[in-house]
Regions:
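Substrate-positioning beta->alpha
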Residues: 26, 47-61, 70-92
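Catalytic Tyr-X3-Lys helix of short-chain dehydrogenase/reductase
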Residues: 35-40
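Glycine/proline-rich active-site loop of Rossmann-fold NAD(P)-dependent oxidoreductases
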Residues: 41-45, 56-66, 92-103
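C-terminal substrate-binding subdomain of Rossmann-fold SDR/epimerase-dehydratase oxidoreductases
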Residues: 84-165
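Conserved small/polar residues in nucleotide/adenosyl-binding loops
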Residues: 15-18
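Conserved catalytic-site region of short-chain dehydrogenase/reductase
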Residues: 1-6, 23, 54-58
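Active-site helix of classical SDR
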Residues: 23, 27-30
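Glycine/small-residue-rich pyrophosphate-binding loop that anchors the diphosphate of NDP-sugar donors
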Residues: 8, 77, 136-138
Length: 165
């Protein structure tokens, strides 16, 4: 289960999560749909940022605690994002000219785990199809749309802060 949903495929894109399973998730979908509607009627652009699990540099010391049991962090496909990269994404979303209404996944370029993403998928989600070959510890959250639309490129990783990373 990924946020209460059966995974359809990996990497997960922003279109994968449109069936909310909690009131919080429903509120996010309603907000994005409202923004889309207002944008269509008014021409006002909207960029919604779907943030992964936010980590501050001082939070990274806890990361090795996650490695023994891959299922503990599978709820969001081992995704995370550095708070400094969140700030970068918000700045870019405000400054880069856009049109229409877009929702973008904002995550780190890697997972929070110390082993390859393909191994994590084989262990925890063996029946979920992969849309392409996974390389190393790459994120399983599709951040390419954020790169393409607002120029978002994650600059920070837990590996910069944790010995042995």
């Amino acid at each position: 289960m990924f946020h209460g949903l059966e995974l359809q495929k990996v990497p997960v894109s922003y279109t994968h999560l449109t069936l909310p399973t909690t009131t919080y998730a429903l509120s996010k979908v309603v907000a994005e749909e409202t923004a889309r509607h207002i944008s269509e009627l008014s021409g006002i652009p909207f960029v919604g940022l779907r943030l992964s699990n936010i980590f501050r540099p001082e939070d990274y010391r806890r990361v090795p605690e996650f490695w023994d049991d891959a299922r503990l962090r599978a709820w969001n496909l081992w995704g995370y994002v550095d708070a400094r990269d969140v700030a970068q994404a918000f700045r870019r979303a405000l400054e880069v000219p856009t049109s229409g209404s877009q929702s973008l996944i904002i995550a780190a370029a890697d997972t929070i785990m110390d082993r390859p993403s393909a191994d994590l998928m084989a262990e925890v989600f063996p029946d979920v199809p992969l849309t392409r070959e996974l390389i190393g510890r790459e994120t399983l959250l599709a951040i390419g749309a954020a790169r393409d639309l607002i120029g978002y490129v994650p600059e920070h990783s837990w590996t910069d802060e944790v010995a042995g990373g």
